Amino acid sequence: MKKITEQLQEIISEYSEKLGQISETDFSIKPLPEKWSRKEELGHLIDSAHNNLRRFMVAQYETNPKIVYEQNRWVHMAGYQNQSSEELVVLWKGLNLQVVEVLKSMPEKNFSRPCNTGKTEIELHTLEWLAEDYVRHLKHHLHHILELEAIPY
């Protein structure tokens, strides 16, 4: 888990600076009415942080908790498109710093505890796998937001 928290700290430091360089106008552009703007995509990462924080904590004391969310609904209901990009970057950074703290304080014996992330069927994943996946997912979306080389997910 140490490697994961180190990667996450590097991502927070490097990418929060890059996100801060995107203009409000560029952050707000929707490529198509049904597609997310950069603000909404960053909002999706905020929602992901919320849900994964819950997974990382609840699965340490409950057996196979089911923690899922409807990403498009969350993005729409949160109203990210109407918020300033600066506020969204601050929120994204703060939540990810909290993810780092939760993962750092997690006892090693809990790395293998499962969490159910399946919406219709049971999909059990260990907390360690979820942490690794969280970093992959984060980098995939950050590269898309920043128009960097695509990272498959």
Where are these regions (language model features)?
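Alpha-helical bundle segments that constitute or directly flank the non-heme di-iron/ferroxidase center
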Residues: M1-E24, D47-V58, E132-R136
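Amphipathic, non-membrane alpha-helical segments in soluble helical-bundle scaffolds
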Residues: M1-Q9, K35-L42, S85-V89, E128-A131
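Short acidic/polar alpha-helix capping motifs at helix-coil junctions
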Residues: K3-E6, E17-Q21, E62-P65, M77-Q81, ...
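Acidic/histidine-rich alpha-helical segments that form the ligand environment
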Residues: Q7-I11, K18, V75-R113
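Conserved catalytic core of Hanks-type protein kinase domains
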Residues: Q21, H44, A59, V102-S105
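Surface-exposed helix-capping loop/turn segments at secondary-structure junctions
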Residues: Q21-D26, K104-S112, E149-Y153
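Short helix-to-loop capping/linker segments positioned immediately adjacent to catalytic or ligand/cofactor-binding
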Residues: T25-K30, E86-L88
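Short, contiguous alpha-helical
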Residues: S28-N72, P114-Y153
